[in-house]
Structures are given as C-alpha cells and as structure tokens.
C-alpha cells in the first residue's frame, strides 16, 4: 500500500458526497475527503492532512467530468465559497440531502431503518435569500473589497452579482463598496486584527420594496461620523434602503454581529409575511433566510404536531415566535422559550398584533427554563407537544434530560444539522419512537439541509399516523 504524505498528489475518482459537501474518494482502500468534486468526476488532488484512517485533500483540477453535471449560473462559482453545488443538478441535490439525513440517523443515531421522506424542494432556487452577510477586507495593494469569502480562505471576492440574493441587495453591495472605498479607510485585516470596515448585513423581506442595512465597523474616533455619511450616500443611491443600523465590533473573531449599536436611522423593524401570519424582525433577531421554503418547513411542523385545538405546546428556541404563531390557531396554549431578549420582545409584539392571547414567550436560557418547569416552578400546563428548533450545535444534554422527564406525547424536532439532530434523536429513543423525518431544502446549491422529525412517546401513543 502506498504511503500517504502531506503534499502528495494523486488522481482519484469521486464515489459519493459527505455531509458538509466534501467529495468522498478512495485510493488503495483508503478514504480521501476532497474539498470539492461530484460523483463520477476524476480529480487531481493534493493531500493536505493525513490521518490513520483517512486523508483530506484539495482539488487541483477536474481531470474527467461527468455527464450528470450542469452549468453553474454564477460567474463567481468555484471562486466564491457561498454555494458549492451549482454544477450539481437540482434533483440530485435533493436526493443527496435525503441521503445525508438517513445516513446520519443510521450512523450517529443508531436507528436501523429510519423513515426518511423525500426532500421537499425550495419553491425558488435563485433570488430566495432575505438576508445576506458580506465581509470587508483590504488586500496587499491596499484595495478595499466587499463581498463573500473565497472558498477555503479569508480573502474576499468582490461579488458583482449573486444568484442567491435579490437585485436590490446586489445594488446595495455594489454601492456600499464604492462608498467605503471613497472613504479612504481600510477594510478589516484578519491577520493583523486592524482596519475599520468589517461587515455589511442586508435584510429584505420576500415581498421586496424595502431593506434594512447594518454596517459593522471597528471602534474609531470618527466611526459615527463616517457611518452617517456612508448611510446618507447609500440611501440616496438605493431608495429601497429604508432603515440603517451602525454597530461596532471589537472582537477579532469573524462573526457578522455587533458588540453594540451606535445609532439607527429610518425604519429598523421590517415585516415578513409567512403564510397567513406577519412577523416583525430587526437586525438582531433570527428569521429563516428562505421565506417561501420556510412556509413548507412550518407546514411539515404543523402536520407532524397533529394539533386538534386542545393541546398545550412548548416551542423551544422560539426566536421571533414564527413557529408558535404558525401553530397558534390549532393549540390551546403555546409557551415559547428563547435566550435572546430582542427576539422574545419581537415574538410578544407579533403575538399581540395577531391577537394570539394564548401565546406566551419567556426570555432565558432554555436549560434553566426547562429545569424550573420540571421542578414545578412555572404556571404553564405540562405540554402535550414540544416543538424544538435548536441552533446548529443541537440540544444540551440537560435539555434532553428535561424532555425525557417532562415526557410530552409528541416531540417535533426542527434541525439545521443532520449530525447533531441524529445524536439528539438517538438519546431520546430511550423513551420515544421515531415516526418520520422530512428534509426540507432551505439552502439550494449548498449541502445544508433542514429536517423536521416526529417522535412519539412510547408510553402514550405508539400508533401515531400523519398524512403526507
């Protein structure tokens, strides 16, 4: 067997795709994960990491293409790290996402034959994002850039167009880049931890017509003055910009989130229509980025919850209350729990505007909130159904323990990561039965997938049926 070493180059054939999108190849019986590639392609690769049981590699060239490929629609594809599957036909993307969910439940959750339904496609495959995050940087020639991260690195690609965002967002980015360059202040330098311009976040409801722009900069004596001039020029050039937020970020980590808000201008609360409900949201609240596909996702949550109007529901990690309000007309009471105070305030406003007086939202760490409820310290009834939509890391073991102790009849688990979902579902299987899992594609042209899972309490009802 050939000895692997970092820097070695090989020709390999892609056998499959791994969750996260890496290409799975084999060479003399050893597995190699390559940063890009499609099944059937022959790649020329360079090994970057060698482990005992596998190796990682970067693709230097595609030696042989496959007949199953399609032409990417974006001029930045292959350079920008935003979406990696534009050359994979959409039906194949859906099939691989279903496989990722099934494989995760089998391999991580140790569920022998999980009932995984076909992936629901996104109604839109282009122009679907209601939020985009862009990064500033300055190169060695002192040229400022604003765009998306280059694949596998910290450099920024000046995107001139993007198939995932709207035409309005494209105009905002192009204009903002020109204004920032004219300021003479540098973009952020990751290595040196210095610079002024850091991030631009654009949020635009699906119905269009207005957008909210957040500019995040480093602290600077003239930061507010520069930012006000920036927004004045931006709003003159792009009238759809109806609200502006200037935030500062002192931390070095590359996260598009401000430590503090310096000032706001205009309308800083937007409204998104989701099915029959309307949701207010701002720059610091979470909302799914694909509105039309989110309606399909929530439709699956509603179907699996199987509410008749008599049930008490807990909505964990509820955000701005979107799932709670979607289910409100079918539930007796709903209690939403969320760690971010701004999101809870938005959820309360949304519920009040919708006339949902039976919906309550509580701010606090979900672990602590569940702990107090499991000890009988809260006034809410014991839930019949729990909907949980945790962050990518999944649920803390304490949350899982609290759910096992509370033992609702049904748990509907909404996940953005098949691996952590499968881990959590596997732990819940000691008291629950997995009825079905439904992947939903909120992120076309990427390997990311949302999943809705239905679990039923073995001691309460082991014969649940749902209509697909």
UniProtKB/Swiss-Prot annotation:
Q: Which regions form coiled coils?
A: none
> Which residues does the annotation say bind [4Fe-4S] cluster?
74, 80, 83, 162
What Pfam families has UniProt attached to this entry?
TRAM (PF01938), tRNA_U5-meth_tr (PF05958)
| Residue ranges constituting the TRAM domain according to the UniProt record | 3-61
Q: Which InterPro entries match?
A: MeTrfase_TrmA_AS, MeTrfase_TrmA_CS, NA-bd_OB-fold, SAM-dependent_MTases_sf, TRAM_dom, U5_MeTrfase_fam
List, in alphabetical order, the GO biological process terms annotated in this UniProt record: methylation; RNA modification; RNA processing
Keywords from the UniProt entry: 4Fe-4S, Iron, Iron-sulfur, Metal-binding, Methyltransferase, S-adenosyl-L-methionine, Transferase
Xref: PROSITE patterns: SAM_MT_RNA_M5U (PS51687), TRAM (PS50926), TRMA_1 (PS01230), TRMA_2 (PS01231)
- UniProt xrefs under SUPFAM superfamilies: Nucleic acid-binding proteins, S-adenosyl-L-methionine-dependent methyltransferases
Q: Where is the active site?
A: 416 (nucleophile)
Q: Which domain of life is it from?
A: Bacteria
Q: Which annotated residues bind S-adenosyl-L-methionine?
A: 288, 317, 338, 389
EC code(s) of this entry: 2.1.1.-
Q: Which GO terms describe its molecular function?
A: 4 iron, 4 sulfur cluster binding; metal ion binding; RNA methyltransferase activity; S-adenosylmethionine-dependent methyltransferase activity
* CDD domains xrefs: AdoMet_MTases
- NCBIfam families hit by this protein: rumA (TIGR00479)
In the record, the note on similarity to other proteins reads: Belongs to the class I-like SAM-binding methyltransferase superfamily. RNA M5U methyltransferase family.
| PANTHER family on file | RNA M5U METHYLTRANSFERASE, TRNA (URACIL(54)-C(5))-METHYLTRANSFERASE
Name this polypeptide is given: Uncharacterized RNA methyltransferase DVU_0924
Native source organism of the sequence = Nitratidesulfovibrio vulgaris (strain ATCC 29579 / DSM 644 / CCUG 34227 / NCIMB 8303 / VKM B-1760 / Hildenborough) (Desulfovibrio vulgaris)
